[in-house]
Structure formats: structure tokens, C-alpha cells
């Protein structure tokens, strides 16, 4: 099996990366939504120094995110939030598509707001579920299709650098159909990197429904449960994960399970029983890869989390 961590402040030193590798980590993910390869040459040097064989880059793709904030915002239930001109920066296509009454999930659903006024340049919202809103956090609108390009200008720039930086795989968020995969294949070819593997992230209903058409075109499918859980009632997510796993097994395409595998270990040294059961069952379902995100990028126990992930998964093999 393959075991991935995500690089971030909690593990961005050679000693911790070596410890993660010793714990069984086979590769590492770099989230390019928070800065490109050119901005993270220090991380690339650390990854090489630690001898980590696989480097996955997670592109921006058609994902919706707010822009940068001067400082985090504390949103309180019943309060207001403006998205767009004169407020929190957000993609113009989102402002154009959203309508009165739409509910927007922010930061993987941790925060929830409802549109109370939709203008040409901004959305005024009421906060239904508050919390701390930080820069570059995700936005999802269940049931709404927002027309976004497959690859951003930053994505294309990062793909040009990918081979020279030792990238072995590219994760494409919010895959909607085979055209997204074909666009990425073409961009990799034009960058002189046709050998780099493609990981298709399933994060919305369009991706779920289109899976059969693009399965033959990808190297691995990523069942990304964060945003996928925003696209449906949470109690429907386990069934969806099982169905995606079965489809990948039937097609002979490897798949990865990711998001909140050991979320409690961001702040606790010991996982919950539910978390280790989740890992074990993902392996029984046939997962070829498992990945930690915030647990290694920002958590207090990155190495311990990787040890739990690897030991639990290997017990299931």
C-alpha cells in the first residue's frame, strides 16, 4: 500500500519528514491552493533531503475558494458576511451563479451561510453556523453548478515546473468528466511530463456520476470525503464511498481514501475507535492508498498519526 502525508508547518523540517518516512509514509502531498512550487522551494529541498520517493501536487483546478484575508474572521450565528466586492474575495463565477436562498458551505462545511441578497458583484449572507474563517478556505454550494476552468493559470505554471521538481503525481480536484482529465493529460504532455500519474479527485455529484466515463483515463481515483460530504447528506457519504470503491475495484483502477482519517489526532495523541475502524474498512474495501491531510500538515502529532495509519492499515491486509 501507499501511505501519504501532507506537508505543512507541522512537519516542514527534515527530522520530522524522516520520522514520517520511518513510520511508513511512502509519499507526500503538497497543496498548491496555498502557494505554488516556486513559492515552496524550501519544502522541495526538505522532501529531497528526507529521501521521500513520491511527491503529489494537488492543483487548484475548478475548486471554489475564498481569497486571501488580512486576518481571520470570526463569524457568529445570526451575523452577516459579504462575499465579493467590498467583502471577502471569492470567484466571480460563484457570485454570478448564486441566488437568493442558496446555502454556502465554507471550510469543508465547518461554516454555513445563506444568501440573503445577490447582486452583480457581491453576495450578502446571513451566518447560520459560525466559526473562524481563514484565507483560501473552500466554498461549496450543494446543488449549484459553477462554471470554472479545469486548470488555472497557476496550475499551468506549476505543471511546467513539475518534472524538474520531482513530482510523481498530480491530483486534480473536482473532476466533472473525461474532458477535465483530457485537459490535464494535454497540459502534462505540453509540459514535457506525460509520465506523471493522474489522480482524479471525486468531490461532487458530477464526478460521482461521470466516474465510468473517465475511469479508463486515470491512474488512480481519490475518494475525497471532505467536499464530497458537502455534496450530499453526511449519512449518505458512507454508501457513496462504498459504491465508488466497488466501481474502482471492478474496473481494476487503484483508489485512495482521504479526509479526516485521523482528524482527532490533530489535537490528541490517541485516535478514536471510529477512526481506526474507518481506516481498517477502507483497506478491506480495496484501497490502494490512504492519505493524511491536516493531521501531518498542521496537527500536534504528525508522526504518531502516520504510525497509527500505517499500523492499522497493515493489520487489515
Which residue ranges define each predicted feature?
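Non-catalytic helical/linker scaffolds that mediate oligomerization, partner binding
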Residues: 1-317
